[in-house]
């Protein structure tokens, strides 16, 4: 069933697209978290900090046993290395250890306990993987996330076992779905669009998404693939309402213009290193009488000064300003309104109308299958609602068309 669901989904979507003459050039992306079918109290945090502390204790113990020559001084000591050191400890002369045979036995026993604990930590870290920091005992693929509907406290601050779902919507039809274990939407845009490309053979020409996707990597990816990105950035709402305007603007001549209208040029600061390789420092002078000084320096320790240093990523700022210009165009305004209606409305139908807020199955593969069937059912439901008005002939036409599409792909051969 898992191998067949993707071709079936493609066939039905293509049938609907042909029936309505829908173009997949413009799509809308959004994500939402669905609660997992897991015991909400049986969660495990990734024990990286405890593992580092354990490695420090093991290193100190190995130094007392004169076995720390080839042991890394920083980082985590693997259980394999601890096993080798435990074997080597059997050959240590008790006279070399302060306390003799009794102290050596205690050290061996302590090293064995460290080994058992290290194996436990490594197992938990392997389950979490490199991109997660938690899992649940009854569903190892579920991740602890904060949900908007928090029935614990009602504040949305308590952790729940959940999966992060992404849907790509075009004219109310879910044309692609993606299931993720990420707690945020930022890192899901690229795999979602790559999946869209593998399913339909091309990227969409325009995509609209909210500020959760407005990162440098996503802007750069869309620019590289030739996708016109109508994607907000995190500070969009503050800038548009005027409550938190941008403190500088990056100009085409390679300089910056601050909120007070002063120009800043690029400078090199010997005793200060940029946060990233793409960053550069820009210096704005004569700030003494600036009316925006309090706002501009609100996060700085020195609230007054005659100059201000900005750390700028020119490429990211250029892409972000380009996204802002697109969002402010009439086309961008229409896209933003459509996104709120289409993709958020689709999640509203799923969660509110269909009362589908929690997965019934466990494990990532089974949950992905369940979500695919749910999206498939929603697409068929929308087709029947908008296209079919009680005429059996139309239903028969769609059934024949879909059956021919399945036979053409030879799914069950």
Language-model region placement:
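Anion-binding and metal-coordination hotspots
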Residues: 1-413
């Amino acid at each position: 069933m898992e191998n067949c669901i993707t071709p079936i989904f493609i066939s039905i979507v293509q049938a609907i697209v042909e029936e309505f003459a829908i173009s997949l050039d413009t799509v809308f992306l959004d994500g939402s978290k669905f609660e997992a079918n897991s015991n909400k109290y049986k969660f495990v945090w990734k024990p990286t900090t405890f593992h580092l502390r354990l490695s420090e204790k093991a290193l100190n113990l190995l130094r007392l046993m004169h076995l720390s020559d080839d042991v890394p001084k920083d980082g985590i000591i693997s259980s394999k290395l601890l096993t080798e050191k435990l074997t080597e400890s059997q050959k240590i002369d008790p006279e070399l250890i302060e306390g003799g045979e009794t102290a050596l036995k205690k050290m061996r026993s302590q090293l064995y306990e460290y080994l058992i604990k290290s194996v436990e930590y490594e197992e938990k870290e392997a389950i979490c993987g490199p991109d997660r920091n938690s899992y649940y005992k009854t569903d190892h693929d579920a991740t602890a996330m904060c949900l908007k509907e928090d029935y614990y406290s009602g504040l949305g601050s308590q952790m729940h076992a959940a999966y992060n779902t992404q849907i790509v919507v075009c004219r109310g039809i879910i044309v692609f779905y993606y299931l993720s274990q990420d707690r945020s939407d930022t890192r899901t845009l690229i795999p979602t669009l790559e999946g869209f490309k593998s399913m339909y053979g091309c990227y969409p020409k325009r995509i609209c998404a909210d500020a959760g996707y407005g990162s440098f990597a996503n802007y750069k990816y869309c620019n590289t693939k030739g996708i016109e990105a109508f994607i907000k950035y995190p500070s969009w709402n503050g800038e548009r309402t005027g409550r938190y305007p941008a403190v500088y603007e990056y100009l085409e001549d390679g300089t910056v213009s601050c909120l007070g209208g002063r120009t800043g040029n690029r400078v090199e600061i010997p005793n200060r290193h940029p946060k990233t390789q793409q960053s550069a420092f820009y210096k704005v002078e004569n700030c003494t009488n600036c009316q925006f000084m309090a706002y501009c320096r609100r996060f700085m320790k020195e609230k007054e000064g005659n100059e201000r240093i900005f750390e700028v990523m020119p490429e990211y700022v250029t892409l972000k300003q380009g996204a802002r210009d697109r969002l402010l165009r009439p086309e961008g305004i229409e896209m933003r309104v459509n996104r709120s209606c289409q993709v958020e409305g689709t999640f509203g139908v799923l969660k509110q109308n269909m009362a589908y807020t929690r997965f019934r199955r466990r494990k990532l593969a089974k949950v992905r299958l369940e979500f695919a069937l749910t999206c498939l059912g929603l697409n068929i439901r929308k087709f029947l609602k908008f296209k079919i008005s009680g005429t059996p002939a139309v239903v028969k036409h769609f059934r024949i068309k879909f059956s021919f599409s399945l036979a053409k792909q030879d799914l069950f051969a």
